[in-house]
């Protein structure tokens, strides 16, 4: 928000439109991106999502324009939907013989610790430039995607048949 107000100079209506754009993108892309995870690969879906999220962050931090912020929100929303549900499904498939509740709790705890560390580091980096933490986080997302592509195992994935995924007929 500080970046949007101080650097991009968005007004209250534009701020609302930025948030709405992200939410609409997530809503629209949720089902089509879920098909990638169910038919092709959870790992592929996660990696695509992490890359797109990183690209969205880099785009948003690099170009201080309302239009580019909106485009970045769409890219970020698309990335978010590739990740949504895929991580949990991947864990459930890869660790099916273990206590999933404990795994999910440990993951949530690690996420909270990472958030606190990220906030502190972002605050320090923002003293140089408000846009820098956004760009750095985007680059880190892309590095994470490369790491996941190289080292994330996917041994128990079973593809769903495309005809089993017709969500609109089931509704």
List the predicted regions and their residue ranges.
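Juxtamembrane intracellular "pre-TM" segments in multi-pass secondary transporters
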Residues: 151-171
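Symmetry-related core transmembrane helices of the 12-TM Major Facilitator Superfamily/SLC fold
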Residues: 132-150
């Amino acid at each position: 928000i500080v970046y949007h107000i101080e650097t991009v100079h968005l007004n209250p209506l534009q701020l609302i439109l930025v948030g709405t754009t992200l939410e609409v993108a997530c809503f629209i892309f949720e089902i089509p991106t879920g098909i990638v995870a169910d038919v092709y690969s959870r790992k592929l879906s996660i990696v695509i999502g992490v890359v797109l999220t990183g690209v969205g962050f880099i785009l948003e931090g690099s170009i201080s324009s309302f239009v580019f912020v909106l485009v970045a929100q769409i890219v970020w929303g698309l990335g978010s939907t590739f990740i949504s549900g895929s991580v949990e499904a991947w864990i459930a498939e890869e660790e099916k013989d273990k206590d999933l509740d404990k795994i999910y709790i440990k993951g949530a705890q690690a996420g909270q610790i990472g958030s606190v560390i990220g906030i502190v580091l972002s605050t320090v980096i923002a003293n140089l430039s408000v846009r820098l933490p956004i760009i750095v986080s985007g680059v880190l997302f892309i590095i994470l995607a490369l790491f996941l592509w190289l080292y994330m195992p996917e041994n128990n994935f079973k593809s769903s048949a495309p005809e089993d995924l017709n969500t609109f007929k089931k509704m």
